[in-house]
Amino acid sequence: MAGPLDLITMGRIGVDIYPLQTGVPLPRVETFGKFLGGSPTNVAVAAARLGRATAVITRTGRDPFGEYCHQALREFGVDDRWVTDVDAYPTPVTFCEIFPPDDFPLYFYRLPKAPDLVIHPHELDLPAITAARVFWMTGTGLCAEPSRTATLTALAARAAGGRDGQVATVFDLDWRPMFWPGGDPAAARPFYRAALAHATVAVGNVAECGVATGEREPRACAEALLAAGVELAVVKRGPAGVLAMRRDGTTTEVEPHDVEVVNGLGAGDAFGGALCHGLLAGWPPERLTRFANAAGALVAGRLACSAAMPYAAEVDALLAAEATE
């Protein structure tokens, strides 16, 4: 029998339909590319590219796009045993516009409801979730039932499992206001608080950390996340780089990489997969954060998200090149 997986992620999956032309608004785009999408799915792909055994817990529609998701996961080396079909809803599709360096509007088609929000608690393989070395969940998974209860059930099962063999339980704060009733952060905060009580790592940008904590300054955000129960808080500050703070007060600040941005949408997911890779390797915060930051920078310089995830040698090469500058 195979041992525990390195990483199980839970949450969104879909198909990204991205323009193959940059600087062109959607009404004028003539050519598009089709890519596997969904943040936790991309995180699993990113970690698989780095040599980790990964799987995703999610749902697709029973349609050709759902078939594509299964096919793409297998091609990326991600275990799809917990990716099942839902008859009632179509596989989500996401369009974007690409205006480098920092304007990438997203258009989500997840109505009447996304299949990944109808994961039920009784469907979960709780022994596998508990045994996984890293478990990754997202804020979007908390936005609606039954996904909300399923996500919190998975977190509670890991916490009750005594953490034997576990490396980390990661909460990607992942704030998408369009998925929440009224887009109100106050409505999300109690559920974020419940998830943080079981997580050991929290990661998000300053705005997402603000939703979780009510704070707006990066250091205050990190301190509030630690007070909420996590052992490591990672705050992504955009052009100001990344701040990582541990429960013992150890603080690491990493500057951003100087890259020519093509599409910034996949950078955070590459960061997440690389973060999991470093956690699994037992790296100290500075090495962990530098590696994850470099992985995100590489993907920001590429068009796709899942297909753009870097291999370890590419990340190492970027870090080595910058070390000699």
Where are these regions (language model features)?
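Glycine-rich phosphate/adenosyl-contacting loop at the front of the ribokinase-like
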Residues: M1-D79, I119-H120, E260-V262, E325
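Conserved phosphate-binding/catalytic region of the ribokinase-like
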Residues: M1-I8, A156-A157, G214-E325
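Active-site metal-binding loops of divalent metal-dependent hydrolases
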Residues: I13, T140, L173, A270
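Conserved N-terminal subdomain of the carbohydrate kinase-like
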Residues: A53-G139, D164-Q166, A317-E325
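Flexible, glycine/proline-enriched loop segments at strand-loop-helix junctions
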Residues: Y109-R110, V134-P146, R176-G182
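Active-site beta-loop-alpha junctions enriched in small/polar residues
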Residues: L111, T140, D174-M178, A207, ...
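Conserved phosphate/ATP/ADP-binding segment of small-molecule kinases
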Residues: R163-D164, P177-T251
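Hydrophobic faces of well-ordered beta-strands that scaffold small-molecule active sites
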Residues: T169-F171, A202
